């Protein structure tokens, strides 16, 4: 009986202790929740304060930026008005771009001063606010973007003006060359080579690309147009046309222009002949046609040639189908006492002298010296083949 009472007593005591422990834990949890709630209230208050400060700072920065943009636009308008007022004092030298560069430099210096001043003022005003958050909004970077855009525009204007300067100088130089040519009466010369061959084009050693073909009224046979493909910018053109029905095996090849690249050795012989004819025709444009014919006879004693200066393009025709050579060379033709060379570098050939005879092919940069014996051997080989 006593044991049962003791057991029931201990059970009751344990239940009371368990309930007291639960109440203590609940009180501790409530205290923690209350503490967290107080901290949340403090954080909310701090966040609202930060937002209010940010909004006020943003309004002040926007106001300052508006004032600075207005001042910079007024400065630029003032510069534009000064430029318009000074337009009537600009000399013809504006074509060379000197005054434009000075104006652009002055404008760039003024814009740099304005941007530097505005940045310093904005920094001072930001530090004077004293909020200490160092918040940089989107509007705060607008001024820097505007200054960068103005500098980029000035740089582009400089590039455009420099390109215009180079183009104006080139145009002036080209105009001077044209006036010089008009005064001296120089015209682009053409050299026609008439040869008998089975192929429609003479194997002159150069590489050509066909770019057109048409039929003329005077000759029903088609005329093909080629350009030199050994260089991308080579201005040399040639026309190939069969002569006529009575001479079906003869082709007329017309060369025009000057090569701007080195030629291979197999192309030097034809280039020497055509360049000599063109050079002598140009050098004889101011003299009589008889002197020009005498010079051509001196350089080409083996073939028939004709000169045509009536059209807009003075033309020399070398007829390789009709040999016009004597039994022996002329008495004044140089053999041992003089040198005979082909110089492909000088654009203005010197007139032939009694001791040194040079054939110039303007625009070329290679040299291919030929001796007198080798030159005569080539001519005799060609003449024997035609017979």
From Swiss-Prot:
GO terms for cellular component: nucleus. Keywords: DNA-binding, Nucleus, Transcription, Transcription regulation. Disulfide bonds: none annotated. Residues 329-346 have a biased composition (Low complexity). GO terms for molecular function: DNA-binding transcription factor activity; sequence-specific DNA binding. The keyword Hydrolase does not apply. Residues 197-264 bind DNA. Its main location: nucleus. Residues 322-366 are annotated as: Disordered. It is found in: Nucleus. It comes from the Eukaryota. Transcription factor. Interacts specifically with the W box (5'-(T)TGAC[CT]-3'), a frequently occurring elicitor-responsive cis-acting element. PANTHER family: WRKY TRANSCRIPTION FACTOR 36-RELATED (PTHR31429:SF97). This is Probable WRKY transcription factor 36. It comes from Arabidopsis thaliana (Mouse-ear cress).
